[in-house]
Amino acid sequence: MLDILILAAGKGTRMRSDLPKVLHPIGGKPLVQHVVDTARQVGGEQLLLIVGHGAEQVEQRMAAPDVKFVVQAQQLGTGHAVQQALPHLRPEATVLILYGDVPLTRAATLQKLVAGVTDQQMALLTVDLPDPSGYGRIVRDTSGAVVAIVEHKDASDEQRLICEINTGIMAVKARHLQQWLPRLGNNNAQGEYYLTDIIAMAKADGVAIHVEQPGAIQEVEGINNRQQQATLERYYQQQQARALMDAGVTLLDPARFDCRGNLSAGRDVVIDINCVIEGEVVLGDGVVIEPNCIIINSKIGNNTHIKAFSHIEDAVIAADCDIGPYARLRPGTNLADAVKIGNFVETKKAVIAKGSKVNHLSYIGDARVGSGVNVGAGTITCNYDGVNKFKTEIGDNAFIGSNSALVAPVNIGAGATVGAGSVITRDVDAAELAVARGKQRNIQGWERPTRKS
């Protein structure tokens, strides 16, 4: 039986931000979301989020059926925070205590920690640091048993030489917390109720202290300022890149790749430099992505080529497509096999069938385009009258001449041709030619104006 507490009430003054610290992102999602996701992997039956500063924002962002919020109205220390959760803890449960600003602890590490808890033993996660300044020190007796945790500001000169520090993450029986937390005092340099003071109480009550350590220091690093956030972001991205390369993805420079979501990739995928993946992205076999592309919540089919500087969001792209460079595919774009979307083309809510081409300088929005269609350079679907959006339908094998404006709602039939420079306001039937432009006049003898000297 496992209850998991996540402390997320702090202000984060050193972030110098109006956003609560735990909502600042790593890898495209809030710090506390990483912790909640890991808690779910560990498998607690009850998940309690202790909120305080910016509670409404945190609750709004983190609301979920399995998350219960507990308010810490005054932030009087970690012990005080856990005290607020006491009425919600199940007496027979093991309690795992985590921190909303420590995002990268692995579930496997926490599962080992929880496994170390018995009726007469609690568990601490500690780590050895080359420079432990500012952290609470793990004090051991001559037998090596943990006897206390001393905060840096309260530590003696001898204790400050200790390199093993408290990460704050611990697991303990709920009934022990119910005995110990009401006895906490705030007679310390900070005037706060330290959760770490329960270690001395455990020792006095004959409860042993089991210690686990993480596989990497970064698992237990917290974020208090922007520099720490940036440092941990780089570590997170390195881990993401390694996992992708282990799965067979070619990253031409792993240090210049960002995954801010979840990427699923097929075989022989190649991603060039400065590409950003956000949200849920699926890449088929043989996909090539050139430099400086952004792909958000999209699915890209086998052997599709995304050329440089393209921006793709909430789109579905089938196999053997050719996109960009400098293409923008907006939400609702759905491309069938072998579609070509060229440079400076924008699509939105556009369904384009197999083999069609929109190669240059065009806008296709609220449109359904058939197969084998050629859309000439500079063509736009005029889909908005200032209030409402209207749809354009283009049939199979139609040809739209360059610099045409298709004023929706309008239907271009299969095999129809629209002459270059036309403004089409009425339907064009199948196989018809539509030309809608002013008649050309050539004026003989005309002289260009000249400047007066």
Curated annotation (Swiss-Prot):
Q: How is the cofactor bound?
A: Binds 1 Mg(2+) ion per subunit.
Name the positions where Mg(2+) binds. Answer: 101, 224
Q: Which Pfam families match?
A: Hexapep_2, NTP_transf_3
One Gene Ontology BP term is: UDP-N-acetylglucosamine biosynthetic process
Query: What cofactors are annotated for this protein?
Result: Mg(2+)
InterPro entries reported in the protein's UniProt record: Bifunctional_GlmU, GlmU-like, GlmU_C_LbH, Hexapep, Hexapep_transf_CS, MobA-like_NTP_Trfase, Nucleotide-diphossugar_trans, Trimer_LpxA-like_sf
An annotated GO cellular component of this protein is: cytoplasm
Q: Write out the catalysed reaction.
A: alpha-D-glucosamine 1-phosphate + acetyl-CoA = N-acetyl-alpha-D-glucosamine 1-phosphate + CoA + H(+); N-acetyl-alpha-D-glucosamine 1-phosphate + UTP + H(+) = UDP-N-acetyl-alpha-D-glucosamine + diphosphate
Q: In which pathway does it act?
A: Nucleotide-sugar biosynthesis; UDP-N-acetyl-alpha-D-glucosamine biosynthesis; N-acetyl-alpha-D-glucosamine 1-phosphate from alpha-D-glucosamine 6-phosphate (route II): step 2/2; Nucleotide-sugar biosynthesis; UDP-N-acetyl-alpha-D-glucosamine biosynthesis; UDP-N-acetyl-alpha-D-glucosamine from N-acetyl-alpha-D-glucosamine 1-phosphate: step 1/1; Bacterial outer membrane biogenesis; LPS lipid A biosynthesis
State the protein's name: Bifunctional protein GlmU
- Source organism per UniProt: Cellvibrio japonicus (strain Ueda107) (Pseudomonas fluorescens subsp. cellulosa)
Per UniProt, what is the name of the gene that codes for the protein in this document?
glmU
